[in-house]
Amino acid sequence: MQTNLADFIRDTSDGRAAESILRKCVHCGFCTATCPTYQLLGDELDGPRGRIYLIKQVLEGHTATATTRQHLDRCLTCRNCETTCPSDVDYGHLVDIGRNVVEQQAPRPFIERLFRGALRTTLANESLFGTLHQVGTQLEPLLPKKLAELVHKPESPGIWPQPRHARHMIVLRGCVQPSLAPRINAAAARVLDTLGISLMEPREQTCCGAVEQHTNAPKAALQRMRRNVDIFCKALDDGAEAIVMTASGCGAMVRDYAHLLRDDPHYAARARSALWNTRV
């Protein structure tokens, strides 16, 4: 795809990355076959190819509108399109760049900003989300029967083996997983324990940063990433063999740390180390 990026982004790190990605796209449309929003809505602009055109226009100097933002908002960032792209277009990174530019050019209404801020505050805070989840489950008897059936029932995580092996790995707790699916990490710990490996959760870890990254708060996301890189690298230096990811979304985000921190002289190399040692 031929590009002619505008001056405001041409010589920036994001501009160079975007241009490289855009030039790979050959307009074939294979991506639309695996895009859930395109399959549901049937609108070219709600598929990867259409969104790539929208992003290209904005990066070439066309002013973004609320409609542009809406089409990018509808993208789930599932990156399923990347699995069928013969040109290996890195759509996930491109849509992040596009969203950040569009967010600046087409500011959201106050209510939307408030709602997204509340989502970031709630979902990325494990203790706050856990408390709200417990309160919510207590209200189940007050709900209509059909809604009550949708309420997630509390689960017992089961036994988590005590650390007793020389070999050990660490695992990301996640933000909502300890409340909604607490059995997963405990089950992973039991499986690894039978293989002679102890699994541990570093206490200081925080959200992987996906919530902020995908709701256009990149600075907050990078702060979380740096904190986790510090924790992961310390654990690796102390003998941990790997960083285990039991949530695919968190795993995908951590695998992107090296790309997102590529321009940070203090964290670029350490983020690559975390990437090489991450197991999803």
PLM features per residue range, with description:
Residues 3-4, 25-28, 67-70, 159-161, ...:
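Short hydrophobic/aromatic-rich motifs at helix boundaries and adjacent loops
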Residues 14-15, 91-280:
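Iron-sulfur cluster-binding electron-transfer modules in prokaryotic oxidoreductases
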Residues 15-25, 29:
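Local sequence-structure signature of Cys/Sec-based thiol-disulfide redox active-site neighborhoods
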Residues 25-31, 35, 75-81, 85, ...:
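Short cysteine clusters
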Residues 29-33, 43-48, 198-201:
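N-terminal glycine-rich anion-binding loops that anchor highly charged ligand groups
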